[in-house]
Amino acid sequence: MTMKKSECIQRIPEGGYVFRIYPPNNKSQSLGQSTKVYASEKECHDAFDCFIDLLAEHRTTDESFVKIKKHSTQGENGILTQWTFHFYDENGCEVFTRRMPYWAKANCSKGIASVVRYVKELK
């Protein structure tokens, strides 16, 4: 994957940062965007790195078969935000779903490991 971090991380007028993920060779279609506004560029880069590590394992030649959805639920301690990664096979059939807590670095690593294991078994 030849994705440059600088192409995906954008400063927004409010003073924070967001990032977008694009399929290879297609800057007009976004696979996912962080809806959290990061206070610092480093914070945004860290989240991007966590995310891209996961996506990098699941590329076909021209397209990704990963789709990302955001879920927010009201819990006892406030709003909990999670990302769900939906994996599809070449025919567009959903084969696996993985839900991960919002940008917790340790959880991201665990999620990457289990997702990589699963998708390797599919190939």
How should these model regions be labeled?
Residues 108:
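Beta-rich carbohydrate-recognition and catalytic domains
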Residues 122-123:
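Short acidic DE-rich linear segments
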Residues 18-24, 30-36, 47, 82-90, ...:
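A structural feature that tracks compact, well-ordered secondary-structure segments
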Residues 1-18, 33, 39-82, 117:
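Short N-terminal "domain-start" leader segments
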